[in-house]
């Protein structure tokens, strides 16, 4: 196997390098730019409107003249007139569709709204904060405009103002600013957001407010380019350790997503999460009744097992594999895929960890998904199988062969994903090398299922590594010039060698349902 192919796997002489490479190579699977939790939100709540207002009436066309009058009135020395004007600006920004954010920014009202945050009137502060929240919910340029107007230091001051409505709206606004990316996240952290934010995690805070606080914590954890500093993570983790016990499903979902983002920050962050002793609370959430909780928990524990073997073992010791049958058979294909990804990282561990997968009885399910799953799930299953051929013992590989892995494995050679083709070819090559005296039986099965034809065709593939490996397999194992069982690199006995011998198959064949 060429060195660049070895780097795809996370278990070889340079195991940890392989883990990192494996994770880099499959970023499209679960560490892509898609957002599982919403990073920005607008406040369009109309419950505080007067009874005389009809909140269900759709807004009319944008009135530029009204905006001009509103901006002028917002600078009035009459407190009542000013409050009405700021409230009108907020209403313009609280429409369900296409709020005129750019029009309001262009009108020059931003500095006025920011100045209102320093008012002694909580109602004016609240309305201004609401308007700014919705402006900051827009594009990066619109969020930048709010920051440039000097809103962030004032929002941070308002976190200690004592008025819960103003505090909550300020938290919401800061959440939108932080959610724009790591630059604004770090800016808010430098200005000291953490301690005043975390003080709201207490039993006296209304549930809606606590949901917003938890959502802001998610945004603080979200970005990884760069990831939050270790000092920030250590400060946040005690709060997450409390929130993971909360009975509110929305808070629980955001808490687990926050942990999933932290565990996506590398082995150091993974270790901090482990030391916070939340893993034993994370793992049972894989069986939660809410699929959103399951999804977030699966991502979090999946990120942890991309770490070291020791970090992986802690998750295994928490009983995670007992949840895998339900996740692998889940009605949502996305969960199937992520569950197989999780297993692929276990099969890339040490030999005992590979054996744990077999002992859990889930290898037949992996092979079934390799055969019948959607293509993203099949790709993850191909990784899981190939990792066994590198990490596992020959008897474990033999068990996969007995479970019928070769036909669906060879079928993946017809896909258009060059990386997966290479992964499968490596796996086939490894299986044949381990087979020893049983290599002839394995080659016969590969030929019967059409795998040989596919390998022969791949000798013409445009990818150099693929066509060279295809040629190598044909030359070593399917050439009439050689005795199949005696080729260089093959084990001298059937799936044996200098590793523990393969136990005899029991009557009726192997049973991995236990």
UniProtKB/Swiss-Prot annotation:
Choose one Gene Ontology CC annotation of this protein and give it. cytoplasm
Q: What happens when the gene is disrupted?
A: Larval lethality. Mechanosensory neurons are born and develop normally. However, cre-mediated knockdown targeted to mechanosensory neurons severely impairs axon regrowth of mechanosensory PLM neurons after injury.
Q: Give the Basic and acidic residues compositional bias ranges.
A: 12-39
Q: Where is it expressed, tissue-wise?
A: Expressed in larval and adult germline and somatic tissues, including neurons.
- The yes or no answer to whether the keyword Nucleotidyltransferase is present is no
Please state every residue range assigned to the domain named IBB. 1-51
Residue span of region Disordered:
1-62, 485-514
Biological process (GO) annotations held by this record are:
embryo development ending in birth or egg hatching; female gamete generation; gamete generation; meiosis I; nematode larval development; NLS-bearing protein import into nucleus; nuclear pore organization; oogenesis
Q: Where in the cell is it found?
A: Cytoplasm; Nucleus
Q: Which UniProt keywords apply?
A: Cytoplasm, Developmental protein, Nucleus, Protein transport, Repeat, Transport
Q: Where are the ARM repeats?
A: 101-142, 143-187, 188-226, 227-271, 272-311, 312-353, 354-393, 394-436
Q: Which InterPro entries match?
A: ARM-like, ARM-type_fold, Arm_3, Armadillo, Importin-a_IBB, Importin-a_IBB_sf, Importin_alpha
The terms under GO molecular function for this entry are: DNA-binding transcription factor binding; nuclear import signal receptor activity; nuclear localization sequence binding
What family does this chain come from, according to its entry?
Answer: Belongs to the importin alpha family.
Q: What does this protein do?
A: Binds specifically and directly to substrates containing either a simple or bipartite NLS motif. Promotes docking of import substrates to the nuclear envelope. Seems to act as a cytosolic receptor for both simple and bipartite NLS motifs. Necessary for correct nucleoporin localization within the germline. Essential gene for embryonic and larval development. May be dispensable for axon development, but required for axon regeneration in both mechanosensory and motor neurons. Required for oogenic development, ima-1 and ima-2 cannot functionally compensate for loss of ima-3.
Subunit description: Forms a complex with an importin beta subunit. May interact with transcription factor cebp-1 (via N-terminus). Interacts with cmk-1; affinity for cmk-1 is increased in the presence of Ca(2+) and calmodulin and leads to increased nuclear accumulation of cmk-1 in FLP neurons upon prolonged heat activation.
Give the protein's recorded name: Importin subunit alpha-3
- Native species: Caenorhabditis elegans
